[in-house]
Amino acid sequence: MGPDEIEMVPPKTPRGLPPSETDYQPVNWKRLFLRPKYLAMWVVLVIIIILTAIITIYHDKVVEVGDIRHFDNVCGGKQEILTAHPLQHLRPFAEQVRHLPGGWLIPIVILIVISFPPLFGHEIIALLCGVVYGLWIGFGIVAAGTFLGEVGTWFAFKYLFRQKSEKLERTSLSYGALARITRDGGFWIVLIIRFSAIPTHFSTAVFSTCGVNFWIFAIATFLTLPKQIFLVYLGVLLLQDKPDDAPKNIVFGIAFVLTIVMAGYIGFKMRFVKKILIEEQEERRKALAMPTMDDTVNTGDGVLDTERSEYEALSQNDFSIAMPGPAAGNHTPLGEPSKGPSTAPSGWTTEAVNTPDSPGTPPNEYFGQQPAKGFQWV
């Protein structure tokens, strides 16, 4: 299998929608934010975003060991008071885990668990692994936990939430666009999406339900694991007595530029595909709305297809063939007055022959036409 080939598995049809039917609707933000059943979800989401931002910005404070100093007024003067921050206990706890038999399995298990949405905290575990285990051992632990967690998420969405995901592909424009890009782009698009800033929970759900072969997904996930070394290296930098901000800023800059460039490329393709999906949906709906024209299609000369077919069939069954007879000269078809000399050969006569289907009545009289004439042997 080439790098651009992805083995696609035909998806099952979700209940309630035909295989090719979609229902892409513009997002009603007012309804989405203000409906009572969504309020609790938005509150939880805001809390998660705030905690994630705090952890990302103050990650060095979370894992460093030392007292936090602040000043308080005592008897009109200033006195320095040493207080312990609760997050300072993370590194000592990680050091204790390191000395446990098989303690390195604990961060792997934690990374697997938090790989399932909506859990978070991957950055903190990666930083602690860099602080406690160093660069390469820490990277190996983080890579193993991340890979196994993504594989678990892939199987969970494929077999437990498949129907929901397939319905989402037909109702969510962003989800459907990413699925279309994945199917059309092949292995390299899967790899770029894994490298980009698109949340892995979202992309893994798309990959698991849009027909991407598991081994293609596994290879792309494995090749993008070096992204994790940036977080582990930041943890290593925190151990320096006099940390230099330059390496840390360079690491952050490289990671930021790579992920944003990849995400921008995927976003550009998604905007283009969204227009195509909307156009295809409109064409399908117009086709379904048009009445059936099988019995009313005009052929261009004023005769309908069905009427023309009847006319031709009946005309072929009603014919007159010249028959040789004793008289020569003027010959007229049966039941029709003579209008002039016959064109039949000398010694022939003409006679109308009716079909068994309509004896006695020329079928073409139904259409107000003269019956077809021919020749018949006597």
UniProtKB/Swiss-Prot annotation:
Residues 130-238 are annotated as: VTT domain. Residues 340-358 have a biased composition (Polar residues). Residues 1-37, 121-123, 235-249 are lumenal. The keyword Transmembrane applies. Residues 59-99, 145-213, 271-378 are cytoplasmic. Residues 1-20, 322-378 are annotated as: Disordered. It holds the Pfam family VTT_dom. It is a multi-pass membrane protein. Keywords: Golgi apparatus, Membrane, Transmembrane, Transmembrane helix. GO terms for cellular component: Golgi membrane. InterPro entries: Golgi_membrane_TVP38/TMEM64 (IPR051076), VTT_dom (IPR032816). It is found in: Golgi apparatus membrane. The chain crosses the membrane at residues 38-58, 100-120, 124-144, 214-234, 250-270. It comes from the Eukaryota. Its main location: Golgi. The VTT domain was previously called the SNARE-assoc domain. As there is no evidence that this domain associates with SNARE proteins, it was renamed as VMP1, TMEM41, and TVP38 (VTT) domain. Belongs to the TVP38/TMEM64 family. Golgi membrane protein involved in vesicular trafficking and spindle migration. This is Golgi apparatus membrane protein TVP38. It comes from Podospora anserina (strain S / ATCC MYA-4624 / DSM 980 / FGSC 10383) (Pleurage anserina). The gene is TVP38.
